[in-house]
Amino acid sequence: YTMNADNSFISYINSLHCLDGNSDGALAEMQATSPYFTGIQVVHPWVKVLEEKLLNGKEHVILTGRAGDGKSTLALSLYKKLKGIDSEKPLDCGLNKKEEVPYEKKRIILIKDLSEWTVEEQDQLLEQMTYGHDRYLLVSNTGTLLDMFRRNATDKVAMESNLLTAISSSESQSQEFQLRGDKTVKVCVHNLGLRNNSDVALKLWDNMVATMEWNKCETCSIAVSYTHLRAHETLMN
């Protein structure tokens, strides 16, 4: 798309792709505070699933997958739901690397990106998860996750094998891991990278096309040259 000085929505849309270095709009930190994002977003179906597990389950939840597959965005939606914040309302700032939400007599603790934590902090975090009272959501790429569990395992080979099995499944997998110091931690692993997210993508596309922000382009002299703008005008009429 061509930059339009009169429509900042165009600039926002241009920040979502990776054709050039300006892809800041795809970052979860930017999505948290952007009114444009809240206007087109699609709340992922897993938000409800993970909320139920954290509130009523007996395990911690691990959300893993590939870089850029939307894990942090999903965590943002879950945070809003747990806090009772309207999903269409932007936050004043992005999520901290650790967010705590009180629930009954426990806390729901969201770790939005495990790679932001030092090795020492990760090990302390895993130890805290063994206490069993609070519920944790860990968002992490697979490499960082494997490294943390291997460091703290009594049997590194068995730990890696079991965790890789859980990560490689398209269905959520519950595991209990034995850690050093005769401690155990129970987790349920969800791999977002193995889910077919085309349903979310199609809904997002519909929202991007239907938003009234495109109406500002009607006064642009070159708008008629762009097929998607003509299609949007036809759709709206």
Language-model region placement:
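Conserved small helical "lid"/interfacial subdomain of P-loop NTPases
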Residues: E176-K186, H190-C220
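Post-Walker A helix-loop "phosphate-sensing" segment adjacent to the P-loop in P-loop NTPases
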Residues: K81-K89
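Conserved small/polar residues in nucleotide/adenosyl-binding loops
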Residues: T227-T234
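Phosphate-binding P-loop
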Residues: E52-K58
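A short beta-strand-to-loop transition that corresponds to the Sensor-1 phosphate-sensing loop
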Residues: D113-L114, S140-T144, Q173, G193-R195
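Walker A/P-loop nucleotide-binding motif
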Residues: H60-T73
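N-terminal pre-Walker A segment at the start of P-loop NTPase domains
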Residues: N22-V49
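Conserved nucleotide-sensing/catalytic segment adjacent to the nucleotide-binding pocket
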Residues: V101-L137
